[in-house]
Every structure is written in C-alpha cells, then in structure tokens.
Design a protein with these regions (language model features):
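Charged, amphipathic alpha-helical segments and their flanking helix caps
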Residues: 1-31, 41-135
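Two-metal-ion RNase H-like nuclease active-site motif
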Residues: 37
C-alpha cells in the first residue's frame, strides 16, 4: 500500500460532500471550502510479519472568513456525526479508500481555529483526526 493511494482515497471520500474541495496534499492556493489531508504519524508492525500499519492523518477543513456567520454554521454541519455534509460520514463512506486500506475511522474533531493562508484574510477551520488501517 502506498501513502499516496491512501491520501487519494481520503480526498475522493471528502469530495462526496457537495461543494467541498478535497486536497490529498497541501495546496498553494486552496479553493474554499477545502479539506486538506496531512500525514501525522505512522505506527509500523502492528501485527505479525508487517501485516498491519496504522496511518494517522489530520484533515483540516477551511470554510470561510473568520468573522462570517455562515462559515461558522458550515463548520457545525461538517462536524456533525451524520448527514450529507458530515466529514465523518464522508470519510467513512468507503472504508477501503478505493482498495488501499482495511478500514478508516474518524476518531475526533480536535478544535476550531483561525487559519492564515497568507492571502491577507483570516479563515476559520477545524481539524479532524483520522486513523487508517492498512498493510
């Protein structure tokens, strides 16, 4: 399994949310709303003979300008446990990530924050922790 395939699978699942642009790599100029996948940690040798590896990702969802009421409402929709705009539901919609994983789980939403994209604007976003089980 390649890390690129897993990241691409996460991007594809995220793009099942209407209007959300997924990025499997950090973009130079993301189109907002965006969901950016970054690799945090890899835990090797989780079972015998290298049969399981845990890949831990962050998915940063950026929705709009920091002071926008609609951006804050969008965050609520993305943070929901279920629904058509739920990040958790979208990521877990194909648990094999197109055949590159055994399973994927969204384990937490870790916070809402101000995000600076170096374009003169402050954006609001949140981070999700995602664990992928593969070999």
């Amino acid at each position: 399994v390649s890390i690129t395939d897993i990241r691409d699978g996460l991007e594809a699942n995220l793009e099942t949310i209407s209007g959300l642009r997924g990025y499997s790599e950090i973009p130079e100029n993301p189109s907002i709303p965006a969901a950016v996948v970054t690799l945090d940690t890899i835990e090797y040798d989780q079972s015998f003979q290298k049969g399981l590896v845990l890949y831990n990702f962050s998915v940063t969802v950026i929705v709009g300008r920091f002071n926008s009421r609609s951006a804050q409402q969008n965050l609520n929709d993305y943070a929901d446990n279920t629904g058509s705009n739920s990040i958790k539901t979208a990521i877990e919609s194909d648990k094999s990530l197109g055949g590159s994983a055994f399973d994927v789980r969204v384990t937490s939403m870790t916070g809402i924050s101000n995000i600076d994209l170096n374009d003169g604007n402050n954006y609001i976003g949140m981070d999700f922790s995602v664990t992928c089980y593969a070999n």
